[in-house]
UniProtKB/Swiss-Prot annotation:
Active-site residue numbers: K121
Origin superkingdom: Bacteria
InterPro entries, per database record: BRCT_dom, BRCT_dom_sf, DisA/LigA_HHH, DNA_ligase, DNAligase_adenylation, DNAligase_N, Hlx-hairpin-Hlx_DNA-bd_motif, NA-bd_OB-fold
Parts forming coiled coils: none
PANTHER family attached to this UniProt entry: CHROMOSOME TRANSMISSION FIDELITY FACTOR 18, DNA LIGASE
Cofactor(s) the protein requires to work: Mg(2+); Mn(2+)
Recorded GO MF terms: DNA binding; DNA ligase (NAD+) activity; metal ion binding
Name assigned to this protein: DNA ligase 1
Originating species: Deinococcus deserti (strain DSM 17065 / CIP 109153 / LMG 22923 / VCD115)
Binding locations of Zn(2+): C411, C414, C429, C434
The BRCT domain, residue ranges: 602-686
GO cellular component: cytosol
HAMAP family on file: DNA_ligase_A (MF_01588)
């Protein structure tokens, strides 16, 4: 559509475009154009309707939308972290969880029968409500557990969330799940289908798409609901058990679950789970399991946490649904390491609320083990409730004349020979210049969680590789603005090609230049070595000052680092000594890449050799204290033993204080800890 079209034609085009982009955000939670392009479309539509009132209508997007529903929400740090849960998938694993609770409390397994509160695990969006002196200050999504996004305006129309709690003093965090009920989801999609609008994929996507935008009216139209079930900070709240928390929330006017139950022992918890599994089809909302929590709050505190989850709670997942469908084709994807991964292209089938059309087949051995043929009817489930996976073949429905699938001997992208080494499970493209490997490797290198090079998106990377300007990430550092400015960024509002332009090209070159001094863990992770994610990269970067130091480390050196292990260490050493990797590292160095040492190396090891346990209520959150101690070389444990150097104890310290007294472990309050930090030359608590 051009600007020279008639006003009526232009109005029709603008109306269609704005409505399309609204749908992509509201229904799909997936905007496809930048904010400024969207704003330009809306602005032009409004101006056109102002000049031609006859075009305006109550249903026009110009009359019904406000500002662009932005994905850039204000970030907020949760006063206490929102942790994940470990999973159980059988009664035996639930019994094992019961044993682990006992061990976390320094008790022999089976020596005590614990009381648990059992609740349904709702498949929605986690929310944290923060109150000060009884007044709601903000609501935020879970985010990464430490930092979430404020969505306060969007939750205010959801029933069961009071904005004031009379008589309450201090800080309070109330946590729960925002969801869309099955009935609301079905009604929404029925209406959307009648109106020719895209359907929601599942209730959770419907809730997420409504909650994460800045038009509260749209949220209200979605009919979201909430169930609250937990407290973070809880100044002045008179509760001693998880069951007390649920009753207190209900008394304050919060929406709570009618399906919660307090039980005695893990067998009773398993019976609750079996009952909920049977009721699952009749539940008014999607749920993917039950949550079993140690009821006594003091025992929860004593049991403590692992690095990612509480030791006193577990999510017992419902059995995965299994569906039958047909493998219509098997395609091959080449990854950034060159590995060829087979994918089953399935006849679309509904599975656990979503349509499944693809499933990974892992490798050649997996296909051979199932004796898969194209055209086979197969049984499919979601592994862990998330990843579609082929379980087996329905042999009686195999088409006559079908033959076993032959795994390719050449890369589907570049045509180069693909090799499977003896003893290896994977088949790999051997072409170092394979475009698929180059593109994915550079995209991985530039991604936010690795080198964090802003502005280097998928489309630009593909063009740089296709043009021969970039073969691997080291080539990025030779790019100039002149080489980048004429590449494509996307389409204009009129359907033309939008180029990068000189200004954006210069910004990108500056971003690439700035990445030369990224933290060591980022540069190390960017190498794409087997099993080296953020956690492993961070742990190793805390020990060594440079990439060269890591290259000189032996398998034994690396294996001694906590949570690295020998298998990972062997993979790292082998990868770093590979001839191609050595040449690549030399090119990075020649390009001027000089990683900044990670924080632990720079500050030294003032607390090295000391083991701390932190318990009780302190003015500084316990997780902040633990992180601070760990940054300066200390080991932080969840239980008191003879090897504990110090117990940091606040109010209501509980059984850990008793254990420390029994074992004659030194006990420090906050003032004592600050004094110790000063004596050791470490900075004070933040």
């Amino acid at each position: 559509m051009t600007q020279s079209s008639t006003p009526a034609e232009r109005h029709a085009w603008l109306t269609q475009k704005v409505a399309e982009h609204n749908r992509r955000y509201y229904e799909e939670d997936a905007p496809t154009i930048p904010d400024f392009e969207y704003d330009a479309l809306v602005r032009e539509l409004r101006e056109l309707e102002a000049r031609h009132p006859e075009f305006a209508a109550p249903t026009s997007p110009a009359q019904t939308v406000g500002g662009r529903p932005s994905t850039l929400f204000e970030k907020v740090r949760h006063p206490t972290p929102m942790t994940s849960l470990d999973n159980a998938f059988s009664d035996a694993e639930l019994a094992h969880f019961d044993d682990k609770v006992a061990r976390a409390l320094n008790l022999p397994p089976g020596s005590r029968t614990f009381t648990y509160t059992c609740e349904l695990k709702i498949d929605g969006l986690s929310i944290n409500l923060y109150y000060v002196d009884g007044i709601l200050q903000w609501a935020a999504t879970r985010g990464d557990g430490e930092v979430g996004e404020k969505v306060t305006a969007n939750i205010e129309g959801i029933p069961g969330i009071p904005t004031q709690l009379p008589g309450l003093q201090g800080e309070l965090e109330v946590r729960g799940e925002v969801y869309m009920s099955k009935a609301t989801f079905l009604a929404y999609n029925l209406k959307a289908e009648e109106e020719g609008r895209p359907l929601l994929k599942n209730p959770r996507n419907g809730a997420a798409g409504a909650l994460r935008q800045k038009d509260p009216a749209e949220t209200r139209r979605r009919g979201l609901e909430v169930i609250l079930y937990a407290l973070g900070k809880r100044d002045g709240v008179p509760v001693r058990t998880q069951w007390d928390i649920l009753e207190w929330l209900r008394a304050q006017g919060f929406a709570t679950s009618e399906y919660a139950r307090r039980v005695t022992g893990s067998e009773a918890a398993a019976a609750y789970h079996a009952e909920m599994t049977a009721q699952r089809p009749q539940l008014p909302f999607d749920a993917d399991g039950s949550v079993v929590k140690l009821d006594d709050l003091r025992l929860q505190e004593d049991a403590g946490y692992t690095s990612r989850a509480p030791k006193w709670a577990v999510a017992y997942k419902f059995p995965a649904d299994v569906a039958q469908t047909v493998i219509e084709a098997i395609t091959i994807q080449t990854g950034r390491t060159g590995k060829l991964t087979p994918v089953a292209e399935l006849r679309p089938v509904l599975l656990e609320g979503t349509t499944v059309a693809r499933a990974t087949l892992h490798n050649e051995d997996f296909i051979r083990g199932l004796d898969l043929h194209v055209g086979d009817t197969v049984r499919v489930h979601k592994s862990g409730g998330i990843i579609p996976e082929v379980l087996g073949v329905v042999l009686e429905q195999r088409p006559e004349g079908s033959t076993p699938y032959a795994f390719p001997t050449h890369c589907p992208v570049c045509g180069h020979e693909a090799v499977r080494h003896e003893g290896a499970a994977g088949t790999f493209c051997t072409n170092p210049a394979c475009p698929a490997k180059s593109t994915l490797r550079v995209r991985y290198f530039a991604s936010r969680d690795v080198m964090d090079i802003k502005g280097l998106g998928e489309r630009l990377v593909e063009q740089l590789v296709d043009a021969g300007l970039v073969r691997d990430p080291a080539d990025l550092y030779a790019l100039t603005a002149e080489q980048i400015e004429h590449l494509e960024m996307g389409e204009t509002t009129t359907g033309g090609v939008r180029r990068v332009g000189r200004k954006n090209a210069e910004k990108l070159v500056a971003e690439i230049e700035a990445s030369k001094t990224r933290e060591l863990w980022r540069v190390f992770r960017s190498l794409g070595l087997p099993y080296v994610g953020e956690g492993t990269a961070t742990r190793i970067a805390r020990v060594y000052r440079s990439l060269e130091d890591i290259r000189q480390a032996s398998v034994d050196d690396l294996a001694r680092i906590p949570d690295v292990g020998r298998q990972v260490a062997e993979g790292i050493v082998q990868g770093l000594r590979d001839a191609d990797m050595c040449a690549y590292l030399d090119r990075l160095t020649a390009a001027g890449v000089q990683p900044t040492p990670s924080v632990d190396v720079r500050v030294g090891e003032q607390l090295a050799g000391l083991t701390f346990v932190v318990t009780g209520t302190l003015s500084v959150p316990r997780d902040v204290i633990k992180l601070h101690l760990g940054q300066y070389g200390a080991r932080v444990s969840g239980s008191v033993t003879k090897k504990t150097s110090y117990l940091i104890a606040g109010e209501d310290a509980g059984s850990k204080l008793e254990k420390a007294t029994e074992l004659k472990v030194p006990v420090l309050d906050e003032a004592g800890l600050q004094k110790l930090l000063a004596e050791k030359g470490a900075p004070p608590l933040p």
